[in-house]
Amino acid sequence: YLLCGVALFSNVSIALTNIFLVPLTLVFGLRLYKKRDDWRRALPGGWMNISLGVLLAVLLVVSLFSPEMLRSMWIVLDDFGYRMLGMYAVLLFVRERRRLAVIALCALISYTVNNIVLIGQGVFLGNLRAAGFSFYMIVGSMLSMVTPVLLILLLSGRIAPPYHSVVMGAFAVSLPAIYYNGTRGAWIAIAVTLLITCGILIRRKKKFYIAVFCSGITVLGLCMVSPYLSERIASIGDMKMQSNTERICLWTSAFHMFEDHPLTGVGRGRFRSEYRDHYILPEAKEGALPHAHNNLIQMLAECGIFGALALIFFWGSFVAHGLRLWLRRRNPMGLVLLAVMMGFVLHGMTEYNMGHTNVVKFFGLLLGLCLAWIRADDEKECCV
């Protein structure tokens, strides 16, 4: 029930999500205290366990060299502990696919409700950076992770009839939400993720190429009737646009932090103060920015080369697991896991979505649902 509550409010309210997440944390800790051997089940398994352990170890070690050692360590534990609790809790507590489906349905309801509100803001208020109950960059990450997943589930033909119409409706709502949200980084992340995952899933490549062509024609037609859309797409490569030039300034400053502290970085959670006080470029127009608008560059600046490599290893282990599952067993959940990872990582190339607590919580929940479903499939095969 607590996991259903977390899922149901995951896209709507941080406060309401925490009402369920805090007691879930207590129940999770109590379960591990009473049944100490269960900690293995709460972990994703295989190389993903190793990569998670390496990432935590590296980030905690480099935090020892941070000017704010305790604060940096706390941020590390919060990032990959409390915020990712959804993954650990789903893996520990939920074994039946029926219950996993209920939690996933709650998450889908939350996602769709926010998208409906977002579309209403766009249609009736003329808001072309609409966000529903949230912030437009946060919604961009949610759309990047979920939209490809919905299409993969529809194309795989593995959804039970009662849920098929629900998934179809959620996907249909996602499309105008993508438009009215207006996050360019999310548009790129969704397009690339769909191209790769659907290209892998669809065996008849002729159908895939026709679908890509028709999608391109549709987008071109929308650009012709919507000046906003055409201008927004054209602005992606416009180096005179402030949001683009500001990102270049941020990335340059972050690289300077890395040059000065190549091994351990400036300290986890210290980007804002270091950027403002020491590394802001003269041409930068926004001096109080708290992050680098890029997950990997942020990690490189704050935790050095070791932190960045550990993060790549962590991401790569999940991507490899998804690909391996599809290639060996043709299990669509492998591509679902791949889509979640790609959506999060690709949107994180233009936004520091690791810094948005509700994005990371939702990301962890999605990973937990994917991995628990895969584990349930494995256990069923073993029983047979």
Q: What function would you assign to each model-found segment?
A:
Residues 1-75, 95-99, 105, 153-165, ...:
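Transmembrane signal-anchor hairpin modules in multi-pass inner-membrane enzymes, especially those
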Residues 6, 57-60, 85-89, 95-126, ...:
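Alpha-helical transmembrane segments of multi-pass inner-membrane proteins
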